[in-house]
């Protein structure tokens, strides 16, 4: 191979093969060589060419088909099939399944016969019973869901159709990460021959093979309106037989099938199926296989219903986990037409149901009835008694029927698919009432609580939920998992996660969980599932307890913060009240002050008083200054008037015109002499520091401004 070439980086090649398992190995090697081990360029190129291999578009060579992803082994070791080990891949609603989901290897067949598997026409095949999924608004050719059976009249042509098989192998002890359903994406619809229908027929390998039970599903675009009963029975084998691997084959066509009949089945399959048939005279044969994961090609207009038997007998709760060998399961997948609603059309005027169920077992097995009309109290009991024999425990049944009565209002309400776990209905009226509830809103699913009702033909009572499903919007994919005593796990989108009632945290918010009824446990069943259930319950309980502790601590912290915020709010309110009261008081004072404004006369009197007070203040100030300058000998009382010394010191007034007498002359001389004496005693004049006026040396204050001399 190309891995031996030294120019190829083995690490890059291994990474690309892990990321693009659907691309053949030689294409990956050529891409690595062309891009010189450039991981980004290789990823870009392989992303473009991946849809051609993934959806089987165009023509493929033998090498491409040989390297195509054909087998998915979930939990099966490599030496079980003796095939080449590859990376663990799966399809779970997307292109591949993560390695953490599926730990088993991917086995690639070495021969091209794995793809076509030609079958001999030695065993005649009867005309298949078909169930038409047709539109009520657009007159398009119907596309059917048929269930092939073995042991009828007529022969099928030996020509094998062009199918691309995908094998799903489930180990007995699969992990909890194993996917519960396998979605295979088909190409876009291409008109009338688009593969929108799937046919299921049994296929059992040789007794010496490692795989015990298988089923095949193939698409067919034609209608085969025949009235036959098809029942799937589980082998009443010992407990050791459950250790074998359970395999489901899902065929995805490369193009529209050219063969409209069901391919024949090997003689070993027919002989083993006929030998296990409890009703050989009815013209229908029974085969032994267990359907686990079946999906149609297109993602749109798909309704998948998966049923599982109860964990502990009839009426008890069953965990919807990944597939395990001790638990039997039936899966019915239907693909509707590309219209705004889904209907199950009646087939050729007969209401014989197509049953998929278990018979001859000591424990309860689910039974599926696909009927073109709702079961009634008159017809359901006889059919149930004929199809399913009485068992020690009740067998829950689920009906798929279409509300196609003429009195339903015609086009007022869209057709409704009614799924019920009990055939005891109140006639078509009850179905019409449920259908009227579901006629509103696109993709609306309504769940009714389970009610205890007698199970017809089972010899006991069964409590199971019933679901009314409408699909007016064709853009979504619905996966509905129904189990006795369990509400269905409904998920719009690609695939629904595993529904486990023990893990209450994974339930939706609006999910109403029904309490399981107490019944006698099955010792052989408990041995296989008890350790896993106990470990899962312990993990879920520990996780729940830790989550509760975390939420309580968070609640206490938030409560404490809330108390602090409340206290701060109260304090702020008190401060605001104080400030508002202070503002009100100030406003009142201001208003009162305006009322107390004095009059003009009062203002004049106050001004006079202020003037007198100012004079008194000045006098006292001058006296204090003189006392400080004159010293302790200064006596202000001896000065009658402080301003007397500040008289007129100008020139002497002129003498009178009369001649003076001697006395006057002598008095005048004496006065002149007196006046001249102080002039002789005068010193240097001093200048005032305030007004720079030259004052007499005898003055202690300025004559102009009365400023002190020594200040």
Curated annotation (Swiss-Prot):
Gene3D superfamilies associated with the record: DNA helicase RuvA subunit, C-terminal domain (1.10.8.10), Zn-finger domain of Sec23/24 (2.30.30.380)
GO annotation, biological process: chordate embryonic development; convergent extension involved in gastrulation; heart development; positive regulation of canonical NF-kappaB signal transduction
GO molecular function: K63-linked polyubiquitin modification-dependent protein binding; ubiquitin binding; zinc ion binding
Coiled coil residues, start to end: 550-630
Region (Disordered) location: 118-142, 252-414
InterPro entries attached to this UniProt entry: CUE, TAB2/3_CUE, Znf_RanBP2, Znf_RanBP2_sf
Membrane topology: Peripheral membrane protein
Principal place of residence: membrane
The keyword Disulfide bond belongs to this UniProt entry's keyword annotation: no
Extent of Polar residues compositional bias: 119-134, 252-261, 288-299
SUPFAM superfamilies in alphabetical order: Ran binding protein zinc finger-like (SSF90209)
Zn finger limits (RanBP2-type): 681-711
Keyword entries, A-Z: Coiled coil, Cytoplasm, Membrane, Metal-binding, Zinc, Zinc-finger
Domain CUE: start-end pairs: 8-51
Gene Ontology CC entries for this record: cytosol; membrane
Alphabetized PANTHER family for the sequence: TGF-BETA-ACTIVATED KINASE 1 AND MAP3K7-BINDING PROTEIN 2, TGF-BETA-ACTIVATED KINASE 1 AND MAP3K7-BINDING PROTEIN TAB
Protein name: TGF-beta-activated kinase 1 and MAP3K7-binding protein 2
Gene: tab2
């Amino acid at each position: 191979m190309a891995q031996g070439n030294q120019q190829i980086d083995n690490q890059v090649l291994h990474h690309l093969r892990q990321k693009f398992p659907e691309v053949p190995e030689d294409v990956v090697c050529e891409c690595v060589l062309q891009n010189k081990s450039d991981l980004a360029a290789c990823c870009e190129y392989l992303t473009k060419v991946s849809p051609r291999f993934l959806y089987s578009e165009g023509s493929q060579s033998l090498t491409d088909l040989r390297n195509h992803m054909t087998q998915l082994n979930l939990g099966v070791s490599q030496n079980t099939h003796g095939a080449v080990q590859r990376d663990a891949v799966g399809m779970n609603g997307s292109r591949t399944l993560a390695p953490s989901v599926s730990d088993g290897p991917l086995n690639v067949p070495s021969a091209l016969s794995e793809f076509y598997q030609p079958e001999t026409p030695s065993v005649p095949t009867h005309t298949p019973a078909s169930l038409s999924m047709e539109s009520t608004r657009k007159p398009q050719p119907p596309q059917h869901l048929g269930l092939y059976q073995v042991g009828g009249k007529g022969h099928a042509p030996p020509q094998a159709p062009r199918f691309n098989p995908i094998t799903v192998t489930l180990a007995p002890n699969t992990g909890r990460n194993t996917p519960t359903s396998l979605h295979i994406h088909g190409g876009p619809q291409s008109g009338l021959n688009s593969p929108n229908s799937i046919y299921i027929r049994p296929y059992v390998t040789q007794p010496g093979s490692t795989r015990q039970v298988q089923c095949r599903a193939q698409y067919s675009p034609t209608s085969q309106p025949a009235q036959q009963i098809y029942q799937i029975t589980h082998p009443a084998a010992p407990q050791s037989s459950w250790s074998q691997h359970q395999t489901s084959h899902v065929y995805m066509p490369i193009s529209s099938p050219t063969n409209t009949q069901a391919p024949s089945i090997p003689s070993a399959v027919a002989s083993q199926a006929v030998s296990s048939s409890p009703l050989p005279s009815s013209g229908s044969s029974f085969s032994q296989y267990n359907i686990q994961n079946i999906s149609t090609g297109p993602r749109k207009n798909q309704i998948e219903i998966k049923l599982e038997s109860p964990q502990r007998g009839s009426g008890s709760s069953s965990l919807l986990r990944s597939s395990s060998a001790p638990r039997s399961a039936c899966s019915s997948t239907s693909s509707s037409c590309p219209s705004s609603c889904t209907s199950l059309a009646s087939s050729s005027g007969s209401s014989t149901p197509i049953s998929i169920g278990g018979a001859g077992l000591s424990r309860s097995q689910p039974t599926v009835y696909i009927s073109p009309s709702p079961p009634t109290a008159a017809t359901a009991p006889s059919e149930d008694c004929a199809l399913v024999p009485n068992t020690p425990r009740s067998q829950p049944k689920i009906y798929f029927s279409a509300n196609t009565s003429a009195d339903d209002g015609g086009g007022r309400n869209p057709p409704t698919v009614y799924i019920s776990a009990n055939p005891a209905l109140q006639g078509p009226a009850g179905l019409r009432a449920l259908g009227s509830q579901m006629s509103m809103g696109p993709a609306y699913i309504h769940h009714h609580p389970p009610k205890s009702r007698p199970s017809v033909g089972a010899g006991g009572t069964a409590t199971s939920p019933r679901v009314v499903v409408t699909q007016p919007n064709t853009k979504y994919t619905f996966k509905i998992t129904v189990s006795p005593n369990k509400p269905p796990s409904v998920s719009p989108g690609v695939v629904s996660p595993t529904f486990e009632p023990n893990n209450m945290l994974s339930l939706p918010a609006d999910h109403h969980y029904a309490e399981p009824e107490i019944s006698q446990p099955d010792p052989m069943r408990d041995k296989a599932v008890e350790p896993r259930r106990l470990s899962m319950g312990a993990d879920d309980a520990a996780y729940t307890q830790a989550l509760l502790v975390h939420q309580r601590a968070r609640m206490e912290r938030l409560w404490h913060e809330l108390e602090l915020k409340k206290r701060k709010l109260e304090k702020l309110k008190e401060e605001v009240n104080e400030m508002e009261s202070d503002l009100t008081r100030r406003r009142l004072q201001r208003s009162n002050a305006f009322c107390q404004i004095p009059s003009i006369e009062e203002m004049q009197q106050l001004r006079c008083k202020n003037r007198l007070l100012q004079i008194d203040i000045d006098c006292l100030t001058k006296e204090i200054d003189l006392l400080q300058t004159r010293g302790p000998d200064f006596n202000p009382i001896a000065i009658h008037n402080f301003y007397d010394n500040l008289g007129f010191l100008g020139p002497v007034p002129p003498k009178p015109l009369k001649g003076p007498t001697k006395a006057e002359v002598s008095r005048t001389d004496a006065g002149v002499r007196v006046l001249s004496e102080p002039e002789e005693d005068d010193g240097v004049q001093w200048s005032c520091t305030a007004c720079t006026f030259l004052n007499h040396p005898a003055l202690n204050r300025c004559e102009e401004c009365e400023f002190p001399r020594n200040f």
